[in-house]
Amino acid sequence: MSAISLIQPDRDLFSWPQYWAACFGPAPFLPMSREEMDQLGWDSCDIILVTGDAYVDHPSFGMAICGRMLEAQGFRVGIIAQPDWNSKDDFMRLGKPNLFFGVTAGNMDSMINRYTADRKLRHDDAYTPDNVAGKRPDRATLVYTQRCKEAWKDVPVILGGIEASLRRTAHYDYWSDTVRRSVLVDSKADMLMFGNGERPLVEVAHRLAMGETIDQIRDVRNTAIMVKEALPGWSGVDSTRLDTPGKIDPIPHPYGEDLPCADNKPVAPKKQEAKAITVQPPRPKPWEKTYILLPSFEKVKGDKVLYAHASRILHHETNPGCARALMQKHGDRYVWINPPAIPLSTEEMDSVFALPYQRVPHPAYGNARIPAYEMIRFSINIMRGCFGGCSFCSITEHEGRIIQSRSEDSIINEIEAIRDTVPGFTGVISDLGGPTANMYMLRCKSPRAEQTCRRLSCVYPDICPHMDTDHTPTINLYRRARELKGIKKILIASGVRYDIAVEDPRYIKELASHHVGGYLKIAPEHTEEGPLSKMMKPGMGSYDRFKELFDLYSKQAGKEQYLIPYFISAHPGTRDEDMVNLALWLKRHRFRLDQVQNFYPSPLANSTTMYYTGKNPLGKIGYKSEDVVVPKGDRQRRLHKALLRYHDPANWPLIRQALEAMGKKHLIGGRRECLVPAPTIEEMREARRQNRNTRPALTKHTPVEHQRQGLAANKKRGKGAGR
């Protein structure tokens, strides 16, 4: 285990004195109607949470955690789930909240929830009863906030959730293909909370309850607010000067020609004089009370290099131990982003997950099936955060790089609660995991490094020597969990970070011997160095080593088990040749992927910055810095996706065209080393039939002989018709 962290909160999450309404006690379910409020004896709600998801009282759903957390502090909390956004009426169903509205789009970004990576409308929604689509609007955070303001203009609105969190600064919006302002500006909300919200939510709620106004609360970590100028007492630095070196002292001459000559006189010893010692106060750390001024919204919208620069700065200011505040101008005001909150301790995590969740959907949904709940109802979240730092993923920016783990006892208690109380439990726990399966209790072994490090990833390009890779706590947890009475099987469904796992083969043996149901998901994402370097993913050497150990331990356990690798197509940095090599690798290893994913440019991700700007924010940004190859356009993105499904006959014509254009005709045919078969006679006939009705596009620059050939061919086919 690592030493005691230097990153400590000012106070414990549960140290606040309870609000007076604690006398009502916890509600069976947080109320969604006035009738439920009446049954609880409430005349009003102190806080109302508005969400784009169905209300499931389970710790995998953000609104359940936030609601139960606030309830434990003594507040009366109501839920408005998936309201009708066409008018303000549905937002008034619980009356006027005494303190504030909390608004979130839900567990997913509403645009990703509603649209595919090809910008096509989805026809389902896993967070809605019976999987019905269309129960939340586009950009739900904006719409819900506007309706809350229409309903009660004088009630503060606080934004939260993944959608608001990843849009806290000016950001590239894939769906409109433009740079948009911070969601705080567009929504006109009073405050935005990014990342995990327990600490800021509890502090702001108590301070509002004690009489402060929302405008007076400006210093809470993990929050963003609108200001006209920097906060008093803070000093700033322009982001464009952070990489500029300071004054450099001249190097002294090694032979001392410029030194004064000696006069050969005896030197009298100096008398030692007593000096008063002045005790200086401790110097403030360089990141305390310091903010970075990012390029303004107007500048990053008009200059892609400045956009990439701003993104790079933001990603380096995510360590709660040393992060500085950020300030970005929007028009005549600024978005002020306070440093990230201090991670929860193990004791605080245990308390959050011990709150009185019912672990089922609200009774108002009756027998309706909620797919997202069905997926996780027998799974357990054992930790938060991820130090992988993958460029295409926003977990690190949302949950942080420091792993926040629950205690073994807390997890065992939850397994027993599922066994004893959740309807339909058959003895199988579907997952013990989190963002990554095998980062439980892993953290930096050096408290000083943990506090001051600004690395984007603790495992790329190599695993940091300070990072703990001992999987003993995870192994002990697995062993204790599967010994529980009534538990038949503990499965691991979260993705395994295989480059960490190979550092402790005992974990792979434990996993393969007891916790795999035939298939194990891992995510190499690609095989080629070009895209892997932009994704910040390890090379295939780690994958090969993991597969070797996994196959060995599966065989020793007498089990036939397989790895299911996940890959991303059309990621920035990927050339057509890279995708061909990946397809050849898949064929060589006899993989036929059914579900494949094109890169989806989500807000705030480093990969999205590459997609939009063509620059690499993983290194220093400049107008002459590295350019990144970006697969854009529907045809190229379709080609990259088709190459992942090289075995699908529907993709063969497109793949053949690409191979011919790349000069790789030798990969077309029936030989073992070929990627796709040659076209059949029927396919060639069909191609000729399709070309029969086409005409050459002739211009005045077309050579005369070609014009005559084209006219003759047209007359022969159409007998001169259509001229």
Curated annotation (Swiss-Prot):
Family matches, as InterPro entries: Elp3/MiaA/NifB-like_rSAM, Methylthiotransferase_CS, rSAM, rSAM_horseshoe, UPF0313, UPF0313_C, UPF0313_N
Family in the record: Belongs to the UPF0313 family.
Gene3D superfamilies: tm_1862 like domain
Positions with a binding annotation for [4Fe-4S] cluster: C386, C390, C393
NCBIfam families for this protein: SAM_YgiQ
Details of cofactor binding: Binds 1 [4Fe-4S] cluster. The cluster is coordinated with 3 cysteines and an exchangeable S-adenosyl-L-methionine.
Ranges of residues in domain Radical SAM core: 372-650
Positions of region (Disordered): 686-723
Known cofactor(s): [4Fe-4S] cluster
Pfam families named among the record's database cross-references: DUF3362, Radical_SAM, Radical_SAM_N
Phylogenetic lineage: Bacteria, Pseudomonadati, Pseudomonadota, Gammaproteobacteria, Enterobacterales
Keywords from the named record: 4Fe-4S, Iron, Iron-sulfur, Metal-binding, S-adenosyl-L-methionine
Biological source species: Salmonella typhi
SMART domains per record: Elp3 (SM00729)
Recorded GO MF terms: 4 iron, 4 sulfur cluster binding; catalytic activity; iron ion binding
Biased composition (Basic residues): 714-723
Protein name per its UniProtKB record: UPF0313 protein YgiQ
